[in-house]
Amino acid sequence: KGIQAVDDARLAADAGVEAVALSNHGGRQLDGAPAPLGLVAPVADAVGDRVEIICDGGVRRGSDIVKAVALGARAAMAGRAYLYGLGAAGERGVDHVLGLLDTDVRRTMALVGARTVADLSPALVSGPDP
């Protein structure tokens, strides 16, 4: 479904792709697959200067989006979150969920002291080096 290892991200970058999606199957098919959010930093370190990184999976709230971007992702996909809104209230539910995500992204950025997306960095979400 998507990249699940740094070596695969390197292969994709070497092949000339413009972006990689870090993804798994949500624990449904293989419960031992790495979480996409946990792959963002190592993949960004390895190939972030050559490809855009998209974090696909595990996004439940705006703070997850902030973490993904701070760690090196260009974008984060939140498929399940909007489906809950769709199932509960149709189009209005999707709008509501997107509003909640937007509010949480803005709140989280304020709490970590990031005024813009460009201000996000790994140090804001991963703590100091030991």
Residue ranges and their predicted role:
Residues 52-66, 112-125:
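Electropositive, surface-exposed helix/loop patches at the edges of structured domains
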Residues 1-55, 62-84:
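Alpha/beta enzyme core
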Residues 82-83, 89-130:
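C-terminal extensions of enzymes
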